[in-house]
Structures are given as C-alpha cells and as structure tokens.
Design a protein with these regions (language model features):
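Active-site helix-to-loop segments that bind/position phosphate- or nucleotide-bearing substrates
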Residues: 2-5, 11-12, 18-22, 26-27, ...
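Glycine/small-residue-rich interface belts in oligomeric ring/scaffold proteins
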Residues: 31, 38-93
C-alpha cells in the first residue's frame, strides 16, 4: 500500500495517541472543539512535512514515525525543505546489506550508473516527445551511454532537455537559485529525494554511499543517484502547473499540494504499473539485489508519451538497444483517494 504524505502548513500540535498521529490544529477550531482535531494511523504514514514555525511535535510521535520507517521533512522560512530525518534501522538484515554495498565492485557501480543515465535520458525524451519536440538525438545519446558515462551523454541530454522542455517565451534556465519555475522544481525534487532516501533505508542501504555521486559534503549521494530517472515525473507536474496558467512565482498551498502528489503518480515498469512511491521501493529493492550479486539489472520505470505509447521497449534499457516500438498495455491498480497526499 502506498504510504501517505502529510503536509502541515499551519500552527499545530502533533502527538501520539493509541498508535495514531493525533493532530491538533487551532486555526480550524470554530464553535466545535472537534473541528481542529484529527488523527491518522502511524502505519499509514510515509512522510511528514513540517512547514510552519509554530508546529510542535512530541518525542513520542517522532519515535513512532521513525519506528514505522516514516521520514520527517522540516521546511525553512521560504517553505523549502531544509532538513530530513530518517530511521537508523530500516531493514531486518541491514548489516548484511551494508556489507554487500560496501563491497560492491567499481565495474558494477559503473554499469548501474549506465542503466541509471539511460533511464533518465529516455524519460526526459518521453517528456519532450509529449510536447512535440524531436528526440532522435536523445535516443542516440541513451543508446551511446557506456558504463559510468565517461562521455557525459547524461549531461548533454540534460542541456538539450532544459533548453526546450518549457515554453520558449519563459527563457527558462535551470538553476537551483534561478527564476521560477525553478522554485517548483526544487520543491518537487526535495520531496522526491525524501521518498527515495526513505526507500533506500527500508531496503537496508546506506544513503551516503553513491554509485556515481560522491560529494564528501552530501549525505544522500545514493538517493541523488537513484532519483535521477524519476525526476522527469516531477518535471511533468511542474509543466502541468505552468501550462494551466497558474501563478508559479510563489509556492502557494495549491501548488505545494499538486507537487506532493508526486508520490501517487503512476509509473510504468516492464510488467506492471504502480504509484511512484511503490515504484521507487521496487527500484531500491532491485539495487540491493545488485549489491548482493543476485542480479546486475536495476529496475527503473520508463515513461509513456501522451499517446500512451513508449518511445522504446522496456528491455532496451538493459540490453543496450533502442527498438522504437510500443508495448502492449499491462494491468495496474491505481492508488485510491485515501492513499494520496494528505495536506493540512
């Protein structure tokens, strides 16, 4: 079951009662004292976003959330995620998984990054194709990626992608500190990063030790690696907001709610579809198997174009071939309304 993302953007008091997250929201109280009181089962929660300086959360509440492998995000005064709290233990055989990860060979890491870069480029190509942009060069770059991507095809593809993905009238330049809608991308990526880090912990892996990213100041190198092919799903949400003509100069509650919905976006794997939060768990589980030498293929989703067809067959990513053809539709179960984000 997909876990829920709870966003708190107003003053509130969060505590633990009967294995439930007890929520006291003074701003909702009117004539009835019960109006401002809600509760959510701890076991249903995946991520809690604290986005107001007047939120109080008890020690017992945090302990219960972490015990159930939930992540806690704290936002700064500009409403951007500033910190992430994760469980210390997320898997019953965590020590064994750590050993496998630490012993992973350099050739394996290079091959895993090759697959990661290919998946990212192909998903970026799908987004561009959906906007009527020719993607022949993107497909060529994806096909040309070698282990560890020494030719930097991932970088070339990114430069082309950001040049054309947004309407030209915006004169968009991707820069973390740049003009909107960079702010929307930053927020969406931060949520995606938290989802990925949580999934890695639940798979018994160290978020610090990446397969490609290795900045000594970055505690989430592996999360930054694994989230790469999932970034285009955030991009699509941002594009929808821009195309709908919404005011994206500031992170409004409406926009934040839409971006928090990234967890329930459908992602397509070889034989099934699933909500993104579940999909990332499948990806991190396959990564753990790679480190354990049970397989050499990491499981990533490939996006479909707006016409429902894929640019490439799923096996292209692991076989190094780009056979441009659509696959047959496969069944999936969409997330229910109760499984989607739960903003407060």
């Amino acid at each position: 079951m997909i876990k829920r993302i709870l966003h708190f953007g107003n003053p509130g008091y969060l505590s633990l009662k009967d294995r439930q997250l007890a929520i006291d929201l003074p701003h909702l109280k009117t004539l009835d004292e019960k109006d401002g009181k809600k509760s959510v089962p701890i076991e249903d929660i995946g991520i809690v976003v604290l986005d107001h300086p007047q939120i109080t959360i008890t020690h017992g509440c945090m302990e219960a959330l972490l015990e159930n492998n939930a992540a806690i995000i704290v936002c700064d005064k500009s409403h951007h995620p500033a910190g992430l709290l994760l469980p210390m233990e997320g898997h019953k055989t965590q020590s064994e998984h750590y050993k496998h990860q630490l012993k992973a060979s350099l050739p394996l890491k290079k091959q895993l990054w090759q697959q990661t870069a290919q998946a990212k480029i192909l998903n970026q190509a799908a987004v561009l194709a959906g906007r009527g942009i020719d993607t022949e060069n993107m497909l060529y770059w994806a096909r040309s990626v070698r282990p560890d991507d020494p030719d930097n095809y991932e970088g070339r593809a990114a430069a082309f992608y950001w040049r054309y993905v947004f309407p030209l009238k915006l004169k968009f330049v991707r820069d973390r500190l740049g003009e909107p809608p960079n702010n929307l991308l930053n927020y969406g990526y931060a949520i995606l990063r938290a989802i990925t880090a949580r999934a890695l912990v639940s798979s018994g892996l160290l978020t610090t030790l990446g397969i490609h990213h290795h900045n000594k100041y970055n505690a989430y190198c592996l999360a930054d690696d694994i989230m790469e092919p999932y970034r285009p799903y955030v991009d699509q949400l941002v594009l929808q907001i821009v195309d709908n003509g919404e005011d994206f100069t500031e992170l409004s509650n409406s926009i934040k709610a839409q971006l928090l919905g990234i967890a329930s976006v459908d992602v397509q794997f070889e034989k099934n579809r699933s909500p993104l939060m579940v999909g990332i768990q499948n990806t991190t589980a396959s990564l753990a198997k790679c480190f354990a030498k049970e397989t050499r293929k990491i499981t990533y989703p490939l996006m479909r174009n707006v016409d429902g067809k894929r640019l490439v067959k799923y096996k292209a990513i692991t076989e190094g071939l780009l056979d441009v053809a659509a696959e047959e539709e496969v069944p999936y179960q969409k997330a229910s309304e109760d499984e989607k984000e739960y903003p407060f």
